[in-house]
């Protein structure tokens, strides 16, 4: 029963993000959390505050306004106070230049009592970097901007 509830919530969160709405993700974060995106590029890095994470999603939507996720598998394990969710997905977008790309990846999410304490986004970084470089060549300065990162909570020090 719990797994079915978590699965429905995960599917709904990805649907919201695919519709340009990161609010449900932000509202689902625990008071202390880490939001991580693999790679050394404009979308990479770790965020530990709602403000930095909100700014990150705003950047994501500016760079990839029609980003969409096709969920291929959702795996859930663990008790309610320490739930691990792994989501295998295929992301598609047209960037701001209209070139359609597809990038596979995985989200790893940790939940404690229904709140997200960790969101790890692990895409095919070659695809992400290629898209960002292409956007930069098309004149999108934000594609090569510094990472949006936040301060570490004492929990992570």
Features from the language model and the residues they span:
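A solvent-exposed, acidic/Ser-Thr-rich amphipathic alpha-helical stretch
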Residues: 23-24, 30-83
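Short beta-strand edge/turn micro-motifs at domain boundaries
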Residues: 104-133
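Acidic surface patches and DE-rich sequence motifs
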Residues: 37, 95, 111
């Amino acid at each position: 029963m719990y797994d079915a509830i978590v699965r429905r919530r995960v599917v709904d969160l990805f649907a919201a993000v695919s519709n340009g709405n990161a609010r449900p993700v932000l509202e689902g974060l625990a008071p202390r959390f880490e939001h991580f995106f693999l790679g050394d590029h404009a979308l990479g890095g770790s965020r530990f505050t709602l403000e930095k994470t909100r700014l990150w999603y705003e950047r994501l939507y500016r760079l990839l306004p029609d980003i969409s996720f096709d969920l291929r598998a959702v795996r859930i394990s663990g008790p309610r106070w320490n739930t691990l969710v792994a989501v295998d997905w295929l992301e598609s977008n047209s960037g701001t230049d209209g070139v359609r790309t597809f990038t596979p990846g995985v989200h790893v999410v940790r939940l404690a009592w229904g709140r997200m304490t960790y969101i790890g986004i692990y895409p095919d970084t070659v695809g992400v970097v290629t898209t960002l470089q292409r956007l930069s060549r098309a004149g999108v300065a934000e594609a090569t901007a510094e990472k949006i990162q936040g301060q570490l909570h004492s929990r992570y020090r």
